[in-house]
Amino acid sequence: MLKQRTIKSIVKTVGIGVHSGRKVELTLRPAAPDTGIVFSRVDLPTPVDIPASALSIGDTRLASVLQKDGVRVSTVEHLMSACAGLGIDNLYVDVTAEEIPIMDGSAATFVFLIQSAGIEEQNAAKKFIKVTKPVEIRDGDKFARLDPYFGFRLKFTIDFRHPAVDKTGQELEVDFANTSYVREIARARTFGFAHEVEMMRELGLARGGSMDNAIVLDEYRILNNDGLRYDDEFVKHKMLDAIGDLYVIGHPLLASYTAYKSGHGLNNALLRELLAHEQAYEIVTFDDPKTAPTGFGFDAQTAFA
């Protein structure tokens, strides 16, 4: 059967919160089958566990934020994206602040952490959410949509009207049957505009943001000396975010995702819309890995790029 996965050993790192600017310690621990991805605020007098769930996402203005009983874990999308890309089903994520550290602004550090911990299969069938009917959410000209598809395919279009972004391509389509997440998506960094960063700092946000963890643009160009990691890094980062946003549903999706100018809020609304229509999806497993969609096998997802 196609099996669930966790990590083999505990791994730790330290980074800063992009909004708080404070030091955050992050520990990843193995978890038993059917645990899911569980975030734990270990800095509180009594630690609070918040399982990743589409219905636990609260604030989505600047990041995807998990909330439970007034306790928050913010900016979970890059770590969730790495878990999705490597096929990690079960994991404990201990964090000493209300923000997952931003690291380099991509998912690459989290991929490295998980790979260095080692990935192991567990004696339980991997569960997928198979979309059986189209589901769509619109907000003005923005939209996000899921269609039935035997695999996981994404098509994302951005529209930033900026000279540097225009040159790099605003549309990307990826099918993970023939694309390596680690090689093609994981290293794409978040990006922001210098004038927005200044405004956010005045509001007490983005205190940890810098060119070490983001692509920063002025009105005309990219300010980072080292340029871009991918020719189309902007749209690739939006896809990286979407993969993480969608993975909070708790299982990998078998679906085709199409989006235009979507963000954390619209992605979460799409998951809620799917879950509200029980006839639009089913939970499936694969007793024979050969019958599963290409790209979800252990070697396909966990090979070092």
Curated annotation (Swiss-Prot):
Q: Mind telling me which InterPro entries this protein's record contains? A: Ribosomal_Su5_D2-typ_SF, UDP-acyl_GlcNac_deAcase, UDP-acyl_GlcNac_deAcase_C, UDP-acyl_N-AcGlcN_deAcase_N
Question: What is the uppermost EC class here?
Answer: hydrolase
> Which keywords does UniProt give here?
Hydrolase, Lipid A biosynthesis, Lipid biosynthesis, Lipid metabolism, Metal-binding, Zinc
- Keyword NAD listed: no
User: Quick check: keyword Iron-sulfur in the entry?
Assistant: no
Question: HAMAP family, from UniProt?
Answer: LpxC (MF_00388)
Q: What is this protein called?
A: UDP-3-O-acyl-N-acetylglucosamine deacetylase
Organism of derivation: Burkholderia pseudomallei (strain K96243)
